[in-house]
């Protein structure tokens, strides 16, 4: 259920991510936020609700299209820019950002050893980067909840089975 997932992301960001970031960096309507791997934009909503200037980037055009549809009616949508592009190839990011969000995405980014040094170019001098990832050893660490198969999507620990079990 995509709406349920969107809401979970939004609520988690509002209740946990923003308070965590605010211990290190105040968030105001003047804050410029970049989310890398924004998907349909669940993590973006709480920042947009606060009036922040938000940019979301994702390589998946379908998810960006859904995010554009979702946010077309948001009262602060003039503060939102959504970009479909590979972060390593993006040419549209000209601003420096106060906060960069990388939530449950870094495990999908190629060349991870180059990634954090690369994205520093988008960070303002006193900006912060928030990185969170699903622990592989948790029941749904393999993202099986997004499987189309109803049984497999609810099967915890499925991703830890030996490779031959997938054939």
What are these regions (language model features)?
Residues 59-62, 80-81, 107-108, 126, ...:
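Glycine-rich loops and low-complexity Gly/Arg-rich segments
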Residues 110-118, 128-167:
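S-adenosyl-L-methionine-dependent methyltransferase catalytic module, highlighting the catalytic core
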Residues 1-95, 99, 116:
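Conserved N-terminal segment of class I S-adenosyl-L-methionine
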């Amino acid at each position: 259920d995509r709406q349920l997932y969107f809401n979970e992301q939004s609520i988690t960001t509002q209740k946990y991510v923003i308070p965590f970031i605010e211990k290190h960096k105040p968030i105001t309507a003047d804050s410029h936020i970049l989310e890398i791997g924004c998907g349909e934009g669940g993590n973006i909503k709480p920042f947009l609700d606060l009036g922040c200037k938000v940019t979301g980037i994702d390589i998946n055009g379908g998810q960006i299209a859904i995010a554009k549809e979702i946010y077309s009616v948001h009262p602060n949508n003039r503060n939102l820019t959504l970009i479909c592009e590979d972060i390593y190839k993006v040419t549209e990011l000209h601003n420096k950002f106060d906060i960069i969000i990388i939530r449950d995405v870094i495990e999908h980014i190629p060349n991870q050893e180059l990634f954090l040094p690369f994205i520093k170019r988008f960070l303002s001098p006193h900006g912060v980067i928030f990185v969170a990832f699903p622990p592989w050893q948790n029941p749904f660490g393999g993202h099986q909840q997004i499987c189309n198969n109803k049984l497999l999507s609810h099967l915890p620990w499925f991703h830890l089975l030996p490779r031959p079990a997938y054939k």
